[in-house]
Amino acid sequence: MLYLNQKPEYNKYDIGDYTYSKVGPTIFSWNDETKLKIGKFCSLAEEVVFILGGEHRADWITTYPFNALFDEGAHITGHPSSKGDIVVGNDVWIGYQSCILSGVTIGNGA
């Protein structure tokens, strides 16, 4: 068992005291704008994943990342995108293999 806010790899995230996991979550981040905040006394099961952005633009004519794969598309901005920060309240249990996407808020005690 490890307290996440005591592990250097999680220092850039806002993680409350006594939040723990057996192995720690996987966190994917495509920029420093989308934040992850996890409250105190949370329990994270194994293989939990937080995805901070990196989402395809379903509102565009294509979800293909032309700007990332072709020099001709380098001028296209807004892809990948984020729906906002991830906020997890206090005393929350996140179960095995859960995947939490950007823009999600989980309330206290969930």
How would you describe each model-predicted region?
Residues 3, 20-104:
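Flexible, glycine/small-residue-enriched loop-and-beta-strand segment within the central core
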Residues 106-110:
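Short, intrinsically disordered, charge-balanced linker/junction segments flanking boundaries
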Residues 1-14:
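Class I SAM-dependent methyltransferase Rossmann-like catalytic core
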